[in-house]
């Protein structure tokens, strides 16, 4: 990992690059029960099979600015080089491009007791029909989140946060060659997260 962080008065700039990590996952399968006709479909799950699962190289660029002593804003960009990270059956080659993430956030200290924040993230995976399958798929998305902090003392604080992600459905048309409007696969998901944490500085 290579990183740099520079502060120019109220402006803070940072960059980080993480190199690709080559990984292989080996199955530890104890039992598979399936008809002989399904042997080809079950082959990837047999005991001892190795599947490439690289962690892609990642570039992160960020900037934050102190608008007021109590108000801060930041923007950030991430790029994950998924097209050059090994995946099962080399499916990374079917991606149109690596993953792009765009983020922005604002944090406001209302007073010494309360702090509130909000953020936004948009993710674009560069998906293709060949990349998507019933056992592994992704969906482009955007997320919106809000949070708050209560500072009980200089050492003790409580954080509460909630965010939801809206995913774009991915549709594969005429998957079975039937030429019918119902011949399609739709990949979809939803996500909502609520978090609470207690922080103590020693």
Question: In which residue ranges do the predicted regions lie?
Answer:
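Outer-membrane beta-barrel porins/channels
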Residues: 1-202
